From Swiss-Prot:
Residues 1-22 are annotated as: Disordered. Keywords: Protease inhibitor, Secreted, Serine protease inhibitor. Hemolymph. Its main location: secreted. It is found in: Secreted, Extracellular space. Disulfide bonds: none annotated. One of its GO terms (molecular function) is serine-type endopeptidase inhibitor activity. The lineage of its organism: Eukaryota, Metazoa, Ecdysozoa, Arthropoda, Hexapoda. The keyword Secreted applies. This is Chymotrypsin inhibitor. It comes from Mythimna unipuncta.
Amino acid sequence: FDESFGFQGPSTYEKTPLGEPA
């Protein structure tokens, strides 16, 4: 859980500002 974005997702994934997998 990446609290920096407030969305669930593996920290190994690059995420968009929404916290979704890039």
